[in-house]
Design a protein with these regions (language model features):
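Central hydrophobic cores of alpha-helical transmembrane segments in multi-pass inner-membrane proteins
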Residues: 61-80, 128-134
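Structural signature of tandem alpha-helical TPR/SEL1-like repeats
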Residues: 400-412, 431-444, 454, 465-478, ...
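Membrane-interface helix-loop-helix junctions at boundaries between adjacent transmembrane segments
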Residues: 107-197
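Hydrophobic alpha-helical transmembrane segments in integral membrane proteins
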Residues: 388-413, 420
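Conserved alpha-helical positions within TPR/SEL1-like repeat arrays
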Residues: 420-430, 454-464, 488-498, 522-529, ...
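Internal/C-terminal transmembrane anchor helices
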Residues: 231-234, 370-399
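Short coil loop/turn residues that delineate tetratricopeptide repeat
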Residues: 417-418, 451, 485, 519, ...
Length: 645
């Protein structure tokens, strides 16, 4: 929940009439506030430490991003469309914003345009910091603290420290710059980036000093701000910094802060909507049903949140590219709507909001004033924070696309500190076959993060590409010590061991790879190829059959299985798989040639001639097919000498 967004002014309207400060410092009570709002990070860190012992960072991130990040959009949506008075007040926003954002997000993901990702990121950071600022305003309202300087310094603290944590995070900054350059954005010189980082850090220190001086001054003169608010600021900002800069895996960091944000949001929205339902008889239907005072309905509330978030979870696991793009557009539109709606439906400065939170005072409405109507100002804000930047990013990407290697080189120049930029640059170089440079970048990445198992594996692959097998082995051993249950790493190491002739060890790692990745067609296919080299034909055939169960449209698996069955003497079985391979890939010349040999073995010479001829039509330089065609034609001439004259 936030008081402000890109669509509202960073100020709070003074309450009126003035009331005596309330002595209650808490929104609920001391222990519940500490658990749900202030001390939540202290509980989340050990919980996530235990979770990482069971699940990978990627699994934790996907689960939280789905059921938490998207799921917590639902309560705001229920209020937007279930509160009749609110809907009437902002009807056109609630009608047109979803249609507009869904169309834009779907279009951007359909055509793989990255600009929308930057918009979501910046809106998301703003949304997170404004939720913290919103809680500051609520806690100060509890003690009757409404002076302008206090709220402005609170706002400045939230903005500057959230921005500083991102600017000084090598992962966050490099990822943001990478997306920006992926959109074709102009190069930002390293001096600009580095001076900007120094400036924002100095600004954060200066604002903190001003905040502390003001707090002490107010305390001395007897106008004491709520100390719980100060504790909230400290824990929120410190936790945001920890999640962006100090966690071992950034995915875990993102998930950690998301859960903190969601717990705060969901609990406060439950309290607000429940009070709203009790005090406003005009609210009916689904919103009244869900937010009645009933312990069992809390379970329903959580269940609805998880059900809404399941859309994002399904999207993360769906395999169909078209459906994935559509669902990603839907999830992104929901995210932006959540950020947008929270900018105006939860303004604590308005009397109705305060009453539902147990606060006094406030204003009936907010008149922005000015020379232009409110809807014009609102449209200008949309243009400033969405339409114009997104339009520029779209234009750059469609007209000024930058090659990946160049992009990553720019990112490394801007952010030379940190493992991620060097790793991404190395990956881009490796794709281009520039292995010497890739190896150097991987080594730099490992200097910053020696425990990056993926970097060790990628370096081993690059060294293998240089035929430096002995140098690659220690990196694979390190990667597997760090992540012993990573099936992909076992597969890479098995392939490496196979190449240096350590077949007994390779067999163990191939078996581990297929055990840890039982649904990976590639793992089973690689293991099958290994078994073929050992002459274990029955096991080889069984693995290929498993591959085709997992991926029926795998022409090379069909081809190899057909060859194995052919060698075993199962001609009819081989024929079926040759034909299946050709249905999947009609240009697979080897399949035509081998099917021709099968027909030749069966004495179906005319059919063999057809297959060899087709192989030569597709590849006129296919010598084996040419020789086989001559053999078939000679056999045909012996059978039908008159026809050959």
């Amino acid at each position: 929940m936030q008081i402000l967004s890109a669509f509202s002014r960073p100020q709070t309207v003074p309450v009126g009439p003035a009331t005596a400060p309330r002595k209650n410092l808490w929104i609920l009570d001391s222990w519940r506030d500490l658990i749900l709002y202030v001390g939540t990070p202290l509980l989340l860190v050990p919980v996530f430490a235990l979770a990482q012992a069971r699940w990978s960072p990627q699994d934790i991130y996907l689960f939280v991003a789905a059921f938490g990040a998207m799921g917590h959009h639902l309560p705001g949506m229920i209020r937007a469309y279930g509160d009749r008075a609110l809907f009437e007040r902002f009807k056109w926003r609630f009608v047109f914003a979803p249609l507009f954002l869904l169309a834009v997000c779907s279009a951007f993901f359909w055509w793989d345009l990255k600009g929308i990702l930057l918009i979501v990121f910046f809106w998301g950071v703003w949304h997170g910091l404004m939720q913290t600022y919103g809680f500051c305003r609520i806690y100060d309202a509890k003690t009757g603290t409404f002076d302008a300087l206090t709220r402005r310094l609170d706002f400045a603290m939230c903005v500057i420290w959230f921005a500083t944590a991102v600017a000084l995070s090598p992962y966050r900054l490099s990822d943001t710059l990478d997306t920006y350059y992926m959109c074709g954005g102009p190069f930002i010189p390293p001096t600009v980036v580095h001076h900007g980082q120094q400036l924002i850090l100095l600004a954060a220190i200066a604002v903190s000093v001003l905040f502390l001086v003001h707090f002490l001054r107010m305390w001395i003169i007897g106008h004491r701000p709520n100390p719980v608010k100060v504790a909230l600021l400290i824990t929120s900002i410190a936790f945001w910094w920890y999640c962006n800069n100090l966690v071992a895996n950034i995915l875990v960091g993102i998930a950690l802060f998301e859960v903190f944000h969601d717990v705060q949001y969901l609990s406060l929205v439950w309290i607000y909507n429940r009070n709203r339902v009790e005090k406003d008889s005009n609210i009916g239907g689904f919103m009244r049903f869900v937010f009645r005072r009933s312990g069992s309905l809390i379970g329903l509330y959580v269940g609805l949140v998880l059900a809404y978030g399941s859309v994002s979870y399904i999207n993360a696991h769906i395999g169909m590219d078209t459906m994935k793009r559509i669902l990603t557009g839907l999830v992104t539109a929901s995210t932006l709507l959540h950020f947008y709606y929270d900018g105006f439906i939860w303004k604590v400065r308005e009397r109705s909001r305060r009453q539902s939170l147990g606060l006094a005072g406030g204003t009936a409405d907010v008149n922005l004033g000015g020379m232009l109507p409110g809807w014009v100002w609102h449209g200008l804000k949309w243009a400033a924070v969405f339409v114009l930047p997104l339009g520029a990013l779209w234009f750059w990407q469609t007209h000024l696309a930058i090659p990946e290697v160049q992009r990553q080189a720019w990112v490394v120049a801007d952010v030379p500190v940190g493992a991620k930029p060097h790793f991404d640059y190395a990956s881009a170089l490796q794709k281009e076959g520039r292995l010497d440079e890739a190896v150097e970048q991987y080594k730099l990445a490992l200097q910053f993060n020696p425990k990056d198992a993926k970097a060790h594996t990628s370096l081993a692959v690059a060294l293998t590409g240089q035929s430096k097998f002995d140098a690659a082995v220690p990196h694979m051993e390190t990667a597997l010590r760090l992540e012993p249950n990573n099936g992909e790493f076992h597969l890479v190491y098995a392939t490496l061991l196979q190449r240096i002739g350590h077949n007994d060890e390779a067999a163990l790692h191939f078996e581990a790879a297929t055990r840890l990745k039982p649904d990976s067609a590639d793992a089973h296919y690689s293991y099958a190829a290994f078994l073929a080299g050992l002459g274990k034909n029955d096991e080889y055939i069984a693995e290929l059959q498993r591959v085709l169960q997992l991926r029926p449209d795998y022409p090379y698996a069909e081809l190899r299985l057909a060859d194995a069955l052919f060698a075993k003497g199962d001609l009819e079985g081989a024929k079926l798989h040759y034909l299946a391979a050709l249905r999947t890939d009609p240009k697979l010349t080897v399949a035509y040639n081998n099917l021709g040999k099968l027909y030749l073995t069966q004495g179906q010479i005319s059919q063999a001639v057809v297959q060899f001829s087709e192989a030569l039509r597709l590849n006129p330089n296919y010598k084996e097919a040419e020789e086989n065609l001559h053999t078939a034609q000679a056999a045909d001439a012996q059978l039908f000498p008159a026809a050959s004259r």
